[in-house]
């Protein structure tokens, strides 16, 4: 079953024309990309970052949230949930499938932004980079490689 809708909302080039502001950023941890878990842990301090209509509460612990990919314009449907045991928020639903589809790894970064003009929520990922240092007798060189 596909993890995204077959409908493309917009041409990805048009994303640059939108007035997006970042509401959430996280460097992925091993538990965020774990095969045993299907969730992105969001700090409880980020309550409301996806807008008041998309925020879980003790009465409504799971809220369906559609997000649009900044890279390809596709819609992804997740569930924004509340863990009442510790008050943390999670993005779940098809999170594991999203990680697999995007080949996300520990150290990659997820960025969620909102368009205030129409309330759409946008998601993108940034690949982690590693720095390799090569030392020789006379010089030191620094390389950046994309994972």
Explain the meaning of each model-derived region.
Residues 1-147:
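Acidic, low-complexity intrinsically disordered regions
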């Amino acid at each position: 079953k596909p993890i995204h809708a077959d409908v493309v909302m917009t041409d990805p080039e048009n994303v640059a024309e939108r007035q997006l502001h970042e509401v959430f950023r996280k460097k992925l941890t091993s538990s965020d990309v774990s095969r045993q878990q299907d969730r992105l842990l969001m700090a409880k301090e980020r309550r409301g970052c996806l807008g008041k209509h998309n925020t879980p509460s003790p009465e409504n612990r799971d809220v369906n949230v559609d997000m649009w990919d900044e890279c390809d314009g596709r819609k992804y449907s997740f569930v924004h949930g509340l863990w009442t045991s510790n008050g943390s928020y999670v993005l779940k639903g098809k999170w594991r499938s999203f990680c697999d589809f995007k080949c996300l790894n520990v150290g990659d970064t997820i960025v969620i932004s909102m368009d205030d003009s129409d309330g759409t929520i946008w998601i993108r990922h940034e690949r982690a980079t590693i720095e390799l240092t090569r030392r020789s007798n006379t010089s030191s060189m620094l390389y950046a490689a994309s994972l």
